[in-house]
């Protein structure tokens, strides 16, 4: 973000670089810390492989302490840290057509509450990574779109209340064929806290 009144100098934000803090885990590649309940949540629920790296320091907004990672916005409520419904916020205004109801099978899951389904690699990832507890409600069928990684590539993507999954054919059959999208990074760009592509 720039401050026009101050000669276009960057306005400090929670995404501004930080120095290592005592008692925190510091990540020099992104120059941010994780500490306290945010670090505990990060360690318990998959660390870098699931949540990604911290992209901000902890900040308070709307009376809640929050911290962005590559893939999520974590917020603290009642002493507990959990992902915020950032996927719902970033997909607001989009219309995702529902599918006709069907009986779920081991290969395809129908979610009656939202009228959407999960199948194939996305369903396997969802089952292996805490499903609704991590990602929240299913918001879409598979759509093809960019992921904010600055490459211009487009991927099959499926939206959830707290994130999105994307399929990377270049990693087919491997551990990284399905990945969490860079939802936290995208949200920070939209806020003007990270440079746009």
What are these model-predicted stretches?
Residues 1-197:
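Extended, compositionally biased repeat/scaffold regions that form elongated interaction surfaces
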